[in-house]
């Protein structure tokens, strides 16, 4: 199964609580940029898992405007910043065993990095800037292979060359 692990877009710092921080205009733009890049890679997403925090759900909205996503996403409390990476990993393994071909996970630091490390033991987790996406291939036996990571900054630098 292909697992695309995405950190939410850039979010405002001023909010009543961490869970209600909205995306900034830049966060919306970066999320759309990454979604359009994924679309150009001919990525097909079968399932979507998202944190219940506002900025993650808004990132999903921006991505959904660009990609053909399933009509509904699974909102998982385990995908919050201090969520349980072991439970998320086990759930991804269950989806793999069910035959799901691809999943987009939208979450937060530090969980996104921990999730790559959990799925790909021995792999140094990449740094996740806002809206960055990592790709991991997860097989039926639970072995994960880190494929790549792309960020809005990488795309902007490539465009400038």
Swiss-Prot record:
Pfam families, A to Z: His_Phos_1
GO molecular function: protein histidine phosphatase activity
Keyword DNA-binding among UniProt keywords: no
UniProt xrefs under InterPro entries: His_Pase_superF_clade-1, His_PPase_superfam, SixA
Record keywords, A-Z: Hydrolase, Protein phosphatase
Superkingdom of origin: Bacteria
Gene3D superfamilies: Phosphoglycerate mutase-like
Gene Ontology terms describing biological process: protein modification process; regulation of phosphorelay signal transduction system
E.C. number(s) listed in UniProt: 3.1.3.-
Enzyme class: hydrolase
GO CC, one annotated term: cytoplasm
Role description: Exhibits phosphohistidine phosphatase activity towards the HPt domain of the ArcB sensor involved in the multistep His-Asp phosphorelay.
NCBIfam families from the UniProt entry: sixA
Family indicated by similarity: Belongs to the SixA phosphatase family.
Name this polypeptide is given: Phosphohistidine phosphatase SixA
Organism per entry: Escherichia coli (strain K12)
Lineage: Bacteria, Pseudomonadati, Pseudomonadota, Gammaproteobacteria, Enterobacterales
């Amino acid at each position: 199964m292909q697992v695309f692990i995405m950190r939410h877009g850039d979010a405002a710092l001023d909010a009543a609580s961490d869970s209600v921080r909205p995306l900034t205009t830049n966060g919306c733009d970066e999320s759309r940029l990454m979604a359009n890049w994924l679309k150009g890679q001919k990525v097909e997403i079968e399932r979507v898992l998202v944190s219940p925090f506002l900025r993650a759900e808004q990132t999903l909205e921006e991505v959904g405007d660009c990609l053909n996503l399933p009509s509904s996403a699974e909102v998982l409390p385990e995908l919050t910043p201090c969520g349980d990476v072991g439970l998320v990993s086990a759930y991804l393994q269950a989806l793999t065993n069910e035959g799901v071909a691809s999943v987009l996970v939208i979450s937060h630091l530090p969980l996104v990095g921990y999730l790559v490390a959990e799925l790909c033991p021995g792999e140094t987790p990449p740094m996740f800037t806002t809206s960055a996406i990592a790709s991991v291939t997860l097989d039926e036996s639970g072995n994960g292979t880190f494929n790549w990571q792309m960020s809005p900054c990488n795309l902007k630098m490539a465009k400038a060359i």
